[in-house]
């Protein structure tokens, strides 16, 4: 069965930056499952998978414009510390989900000042070309529920209410934050299966 829209694909992969640094991987023993054609992966990787089948293994270079986009200086902001109420100690490198008019946006603290914090809303791989080694582990039909929800439900998945955020995130009032539970990877917002 060839990878096409509305099929569930299980893939193992490694992704490296141009200088060879491994930034994420999912081994054959724990492949990433996603619903093809629903924007769960960065465009360049999803496009490269189209037409492949179980057992195929290949390398693909994904340019920044088909990955996490260009680095945008406008996504770096200086905000008052009190925006992070309830967080005892703010440190460089901490990640949060900021609630915005466009929905939750992952941000990373890049500087901590006396009264302010500098946050960067760019994905940590923004502006970088990426090299993937991919193995298609399996391809199957999606269930009706998976098609309705637009993502894969595995044996360890849980049912959710519509409106819940991805990776356990949920909405807050404007400018509130919560810790992000994902990490960088081939998904559109940092976690491999989340967007």
Swiss-Prot record:
Protein location: Cytoplasm
Protein name: FKBP-type peptidyl-prolyl cis-trans isomerase SlyD
Spans annotated as PPIase first part: 1-69
Residues that, per the record, bind Ni(2+): 166-167, 186, 192, 194
One matching Pfam family: FKBP_C
PPIase second part: annotated span: 129-151
Keywords: Chaperone, Cytoplasm, Isomerase, Metal-binding, Nickel, Rotamase
GO biological process, alphabetically ordered: protein refolding
Residues covered by region (IF-chaperone): 76-120
Single GO MF descriptor: peptidyl-prolyl cis-trans isomerase activity
Record-stated family: Belongs to the FKBP-type PPIase family.
EC code(s) of this entry: 5.2.1.8
Organism: Yersinia pestis
């Amino acid at each position: 069965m060839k990878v096409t829209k509305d099929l569930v694909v299980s893939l193992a992969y490694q992704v490296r930056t141009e200088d060879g640094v491994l930034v994420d991987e999912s081994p054959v023993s724990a492949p990433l499952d996603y619903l093809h054609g629903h924007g769960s992966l960065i465009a360049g990787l999803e496009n490269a998978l189209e037409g492949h089948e179980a057992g195929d293994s290949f390398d693909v270079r994904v340019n920044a414009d088909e990955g996490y986009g260009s680095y945008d200086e406008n996504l770096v902001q200086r905000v008052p510390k009190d925006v992070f109420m309830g967080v005892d100690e703010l440190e460089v490198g901490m990640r949060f989900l900021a609630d915005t008019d466009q929905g939750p946006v992952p941000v990373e603290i890049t500087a901590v000042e006396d009264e302010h914090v500098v946050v960067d809303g760019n994905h940590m791989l923004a502006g970088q070309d990426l090299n993937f080694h991919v193995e298609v582990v399996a391809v199957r039909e999606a269930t009706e529920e998976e098609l309705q929800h637009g993502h894969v439900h595995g044996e360890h998945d849980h049912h959710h209410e519509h409106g819940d955020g991805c990776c356990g995130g949920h909405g807050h009032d404007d400018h509130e934050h919560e810790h992000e539970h994902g990490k960088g990877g081939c998904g559109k917002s940092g976690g491999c299966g989340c967007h």
